[in-house]
């Protein structure tokens, strides 16, 4: 699935990634069924797999480390979200493990510019070649949006968390919408070339209004695996973007 990214420039990769409106939180499923999940997602041409890497220090939860990135099939786009105390070391390990997209927490590192600049020089393998590492910045619900201003030129993905990581407390829908509006206002004419992502316990009925506001992608885990209906739920969630945005380049198998 990721062969279409081989040899593309950073700008072309971002444009292509923007046509995939869903990143599947693969760790939310039953690990014993991982092979079945991956087969279903491949059949749906759903390349983006989202992995939350937590170390129990940035937030009170442990998940997996960079080793998990390497274990996933090479055919997928591995979308890694770092929620760790040492983002620099973790970012290096994730690139070595084959992560295609790496999102840092704005609150997690005073040396964000250094890490993002380094990531901007890295490439990772895809089927048939290589692609540049796509860089993201993520913000907790209470983090002021203007902290991203100094690094806007160093990121392609801006991710707003709708939950407090490791705690599960959610933003009210009205507050989330206001935050999206504030982000769009902040970006202004720098909106082009940025993928805006919402991550955190969204329900399907929240999607239409968020899509109408102009977001590009959502990250979903538990909701997609609900009732052991990953394929059906993935189709349904992707269809929401098709109806609302008429995304021309959305994969046809949905």
Curated annotation (Swiss-Prot):
Family: Belongs to the ribulose-phosphate 3-epimerase family.
Superkingdom of the source species: Bacteria
Residues the entry annotates as binding a divalent metal cation: 50, 52, 81, 199
Residues holding substrate: 81, 166-169, 199-201, 221-222
UniProt EC number: 5.1.3.-
InterPro entries: Aldolase_TIM, Ribul_P_3_epim-like, RibuloseP-bd_barrel
UniProt KW keywords: Cell membrane, Isomerase, Membrane, Metal-binding, Transmembrane, Transmembrane helix
GO biological process, one term: carbohydrate metabolic process
Residues at the catalytic site: 52 (proton acceptor), 199 (proton donor)
Gene3D superfamilies per the UniProt record, alphabetical: Aldolase class I
Top-level EC class as recorded in UniProt: isomerase
Membrane topology: Single-pass membrane protein
Gene from which this protein is expressed: lsrE
Main subcellular location of this protein, as a coarse class: membrane
Annotated localization: Cell membrane
Cofactors required: a divalent metal cation
One cellular-component annotation, GO: plasma membrane
A Pfam family per the record: Ribul_P_3_epim
Protein name as it appears in the record: Putative epimerase LsrE
Entry note: cofactor: Binds 1 divalent metal cation per subunit.
């Amino acid at each position: 699935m990721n062969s279409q990214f081989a040899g593309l420039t950073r700008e072309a990769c971002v444009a292509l990634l923007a046509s995939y409106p869903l990143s599947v939180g693969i760790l939310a499923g039953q690990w014993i069924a991982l092979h079945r999940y991956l087969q279903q997602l491949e059949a749906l041409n759903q390349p983006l797999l989202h992995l939350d890497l937590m170390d129990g220090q940035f937030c009170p939860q442990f998940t997996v480390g960079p080793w998990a990135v390497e274990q996933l099939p090479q055919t997928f786009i591995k979308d890694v979200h770092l929620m760790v105390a040492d983002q620099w070391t973790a970012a290096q390990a994730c690139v070595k493990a084959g992560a295609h997209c790496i999102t840092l927490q704005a609150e997690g590192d005073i040396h964000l510019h250094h890490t993002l600049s380094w990531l901007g020089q890295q490439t990772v393998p895809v089927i048939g070649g290589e692609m540049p590492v796509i860089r993201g910045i993520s913000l907790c619900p209470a983090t002021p949006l203007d902290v991203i201003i100094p690094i806007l030129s160093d990121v392609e993905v801006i991710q707003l968390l709708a939950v407090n990581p490791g705690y599960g407390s959610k933003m009210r829908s009205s507050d989330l919408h206001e935050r999206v509006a504030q982000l769009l206002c902040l970006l202004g004419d720098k909106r082009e070339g940025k993928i805006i992502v919402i991550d955190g316990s969204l329900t399907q009925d929240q999607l239409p209004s968020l899509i109408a506001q102009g977001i590009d992608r959502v990250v979903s885990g538990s909701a997609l695996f609900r009732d052991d209906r990953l394929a059906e739920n993935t189709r349904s969630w992707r269809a929401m973007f098709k109806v609302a945005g008429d995304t021309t380049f959305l994969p046809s198998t949905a």
